[in-house]
Swiss-Prot record:
PANTHER family: GLYCOPROTEIN HORMONE ALPHA CHAIN, GLYCOPROTEIN HORMONES ALPHA CHAIN
Function: Shared alpha chain of heterodimeric glycoprotein hormones. These hormones bind specific receptors on target cells that in turn activate downstream signaling pathways.
S-S pairs: C11-C35, C14-C64, C32-C86, C36-C88, C63-C91
Alphabetized UniProt keyword annotations: Disulfide bond, Glycoprotein, Hormone, Secreted
Listed GO CC annotations: extracellular space; follicle-stimulating hormone complex
Gene behind this protein: CGA
Name this polypeptide is given: Glycoprotein hormones alpha chain
GO molecular function: follicle-stimulating hormone activity
Similarity annotation: Belongs to the glycoprotein hormones subunit alpha family.
Length: 96
């Protein structure tokens, strides 16, 4: 696929989407949503030998994250990030 970009069926590209929970009329709040690259493959034997807990499958992924944002304060002094630009980058939060 050109430049590693592709769309999976039923999974939209990584882009800004309005967060309806935090948005107010005339003051929209945006967050990055959508899909990026991921793949899974058998773990190479040489890598398995160095693992504390050997795993048969290795996975790689990038996540849809904010490339740029502004910090805003909502009522009750709640601070959130209003995303202004998105890209596919390192996933910071993983399920165990």
């Amino acid at each position: 696929f050109p430049d590693g970009e592709f769309l999976m069926q039923g999974c939209p590209e990584c882009k800004l989407g309005e967060n309806r929970f935090f948005s107010k009329p005339g003051a929209p709040v945006y967050q990055c949503t959508g899909c990026c690259f991921s793949r899974a493959y058998p773990t190479p034997l040489r890598s398995k030998k160095t693992m504390l807990v050997p795993k048969n499958i290795t996975s790689e992924a990038t996540c849809c994250v904010a490339k740029a944002f502004t910090k805003i304060t909502l009522k009750d002094n709640v601070k959130i990030e209003n995303h202004t630009e998105c890209h596919c980058s390192t996933c910071y939060y993983h399920k165990s």
